[in-house]
Amino acid sequence: MAGLAPEGSQFDARQYDAKMTELLGTEQQEFFTSYDEVYESFDAMGLQENLLRGIYAYGFEKPSAIQQRGIVPFCKGLDVIQQAQSGTGKTATFCSGILQQLDYSLVECQALVLAPTRELAQQIEKVMRALGDYLGVKVHACVGGTSVREDQRILQSGVHVVVGTPGRVFDMLRRQSLRPDNIKMFVLDEADEMLSRGFKDQIYDIFQLLPPKIQVGVFSATMPPEALEITRKFMNKPVRILVKRDELTLEGIKQFYVNVDKEEWKLETLCDLYETLAITQSVIFVNTRRKVDWLTDKMRGRDHTVSATHGDMDQNTRDIIMREFRSGSSRVLITTDLLARGIDVQQVSLVINYDLPTQPENYLHRIGHSGRFGRKGVSINFVTKDDERMLFDIQKFYNVVIEELPANVADLL
């Protein structure tokens, strides 16, 4: 049935085990390392002083659920599979694990992180650089749409960590500009998304070029069967860290829907909302690039300052737009799912799904941004007759109830 979550997409330990049993048969018992320690504070994790300084300077106070369980096993050099949604602090989990283990006197690539999109790779590069600020870490993002020669120059001058998209990273390995000899940590972020974008072969090709003894981390919001296959091929007795299904609520985010009889009436509904609410910063999601342009024109025509990004724009333009949005000079960003995972703006208090996503999984990536690390956020979904089924699927998929938008919505923001 169209619109329903694909089987095995929401991470469920029982389902995962059943799938692994199917793949591994009787070896399954020996496959995982059990690790149950939970660390309530960053100070208790035994991290280097300068890494802690970076963590606190970045604004983290208390570790999130995934950080409490995930940082230490990674620091110990264990293979880890971690399942957590966007906005839970998983990027900082593997960044901390990598930064703790680097040999800073050796200016060679020691850690390789793969991500599905340029935006996400650049986001990870930023977090890594900020957390490693007091350690003097050298990080570089190798992504498509940028100068190959510039990549080669930076890699040859020496870096500790490379973050990138599979295509460009493989290219750099093939050209021998990125030398794999000292790489000891390999992380796949948003593994589900990389696989669904058809990067499987490239990931396998990259893995073949890495040293045989390597620590592997797989991070994924969902776990489709292909991700399990990677787990089995690449990993050695991984520690499995689940933020359990009931913790995978979209905690701290109030979710509402607005019934809109006709598609044409969404614009009026949107403008009414902006007139009644004092919104600091908001992101509006639509499903097509053309609609991004259309809605941007309509909003500007009504004197709203809005920014827009989508996949047809070149990288440079997108970077400039995201910078404006982050700095607050533009308060509204209109975009598509493609960029949902690369948006990390701490002040976003409202996400509007002008169009509901076409798959339930993407709902989490969109609205996970409005409630980062315990900040309260609000998401409002515009629902036409045709969307009712998808709204139902989303509620079922995440086990949430999305209520009709109350009249006093202004008090919630």
Swiss-Prot record:
E.C. code: 3.6.4.13
Enzyme class, spelled out: hydrolase
GO molecular function terms attached to this record: ATP binding; ATP hydrolysis activity; RNA binding; RNA helicase activity; translation initiation factor activity
Domain of life: Eukaryota
Positions occupied by motif DEAD box: 189-192
Positions of the Helicase ATP-binding domain: 71-241
Domain Helicase C-terminal: 252-413
Reactions performed catalytically: ATP + H2O = ADP + phosphate + H(+)
Record-linked InterPro entries: DEAD/DEAH_box_helicase_dom (IPR011545), Helicase_ATP-bd (IPR014001), Helicase_C-like (IPR001650), P-loop_NTPase (IPR027417), RNA-helicase_DEAD-box_CS (IPR000629), RNA_helicase_DEAD_Q_motif (IPR014014)
SMART domains noted in UniProt: DEXDc, HELICc
Residues engaged in binding ATP: 84-91
Pfam families per the UniProt record, alphabetical: DEAD, Helicase_C
Keyword Aminoacyl-tRNA synthetase: no
Calcium among keywords: no
GO cellular component: cytoplasmic stress granule
Position of sequence motif Q motif: 40-68
Swiss-Prot/TrEMBL keywords: ATP-binding, Helicase, Hydrolase, Initiation factor, Nucleotide-binding, Protein biosynthesis, RNA-binding
Family to which this protein belongs: Belongs to the DEAD box helicase family. eIF4A subfamily.
Function comment: ATP-dependent RNA helicase which is a subunit of the eIF4F complex involved in cap recognition and is required for mRNA binding to ribosome. In the current model of translation initiation, eIF4A unwinds RNA secondary structures in the 5'-UTR of mRNAs which is necessary to allow efficient binding of the small ribosomal subunit, and subsequent scanning for the initiator codon.
Subunit-level organization: eIF4F is a multi-subunit complex, the composition of which varies with external and internal environmental conditions. It is composed of at least EIF4A, EIF4E and EIF4G.
Official protein name in the record: Eukaryotic initiation factor 4A-11
Organism, scientific name: Nicotiana tabacum (Common tobacco)
